[in-house]
Amino acid sequence: KRFVFPFPVLNDKKITGYILSKYRLKTINDVLSICPNGLYPFAFFFNGALISCDAIKQIGNVDKNFFIAGEEVDYFYRLRAVGKVLTDMNAHHYHPNVYERTWSDLKIYYYTKNTIILNKRHLNMATLRNIFFAVVATFYRIFLHNGWTGIISYLYRNNLKFLVIAIQRGLNGRVGIDFLDKK
């Protein structure tokens, strides 16, 4: 059975090229083939997560400024800064298939902006190349959730303006609820 969220293949520093890694572990057997003990040093939050109270005391709560997209990624990297974060392949939980839902303009805006912020903040990836990949990843996600018509709407309608604003605000590190802000 395939994961709803395939696990990334990690490098020697246990870091993933989170934006567009072409190597993904799509099944439990894929993970077990490289991690036979079943404890993989990566996690998707928050479904099924068991988090130490001590870790929460050290890093605080979820950053609500990562509205709609990215709060789980930010929390993962903050947790990892204070200790190990693992997924136990013996613990199973169900998550509905997220690809059956279309993404709104709001979701696309925050996904784009927050992906850029997270890559700058936690992966030191503020290069033009990585920003380009963040935008490509956004278009890939639009395609997965909304199909070709979704992509076309971002290239030829008013939606392109929102995408450019999301990129600018991501580069500026502007977190928070600001979709309708004019500045």
Provide a role label for each language-model segment:
Residues L106-N114, M125-K183:
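Non-catalytic, C-terminal membrane-associated alpha-helical segments of glycosyltransferases
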